[in-house]
Amino acid sequence: MRPGEIITGDGPVPLNPGRPRVRITVVNRADRAVQVGSHYHFAAVNEGLEFDRAAAWGHRLDVPAGTAVRFEPGVEREVRLVPVGGSRRVPGLRPEYAGELDGRGHEPTAPNYGEKGQGHFE
């Protein structure tokens, strides 16, 4: 073995095994690409992305850790989300979305959350 060498097992590594998944359709209405990282609270992403934010509440992208998904302007795509794990507490990020994910009605405190034209549709 060499320093830094990684010895992997045989076969693929399952991604988020046994976790429930949600599929949502996202449209980038912004004039430039938006990139979202693997562990970012999806409901709090750039308001240029339009999707059902209530359905995304408490979820993150179902992609390998350290990767991201890029949303090009005007393009619609479907993404798969999994619940945020661990303590289900989101620190920082955007203040109106930060804190406990459970126990507050699954709605952030942002005054415009859920309004049409604020990156939300049902």
From Swiss-Prot:
Enzyme class: hydrolase
InterPro entries: Urease_beta-like (IPR002019), Urease_betasu_sf (IPR036461), Urease_subunit (IPR050069)
Gene Ontology MF terms: urease activity
Annotated GO biological process: urea catabolic process
Annotated metabolic or biological route of this protein: Nitrogen metabolism; urea degradation; CO(2) and NH(3) from urea (urease route): step 1/1
Enzyme nomenclature, EC number: 3.5.1.5
Pfam families: Urease_beta
Record-annotated membrane-spanning stretches: none
Highest taxon of source: Bacteria
Keywords: Cytoplasm, Hydrolase
Region of interest called Disordered, as start-end residue ranges on this chain: 92-122
Catalytic activity from the UniProt record: urea + 2 H2O + H(+) = hydrogencarbonate + 2 NH4(+)
Major localization class: cytoplasm
Gene Ontology cellular-component annotations: urease complex
Localization per Swiss-Prot or TrEMBL: Cytoplasm
Subunit annotation: Heterotrimer of UreA (gamma), UreB (beta) and UreC (alpha) subunits. Three heterotrimers associate to form the active enzyme.
Entry's family note: Belongs to the urease beta subunit family.
PANTHER family in the cross-refs: UREASE
Designated name of the protein: Urease subunit beta
Source organism of this protein record: Saccharopolyspora erythraea (strain ATCC 11635 / DSM 40517 / JCM 4748 / NBRC 13426 / NCIMB 8594 / NRRL 2338)
Highest classification ranks of the organism: Bacteria, Bacillati, Actinomycetota, Actinomycetes, Pseudonocardiales
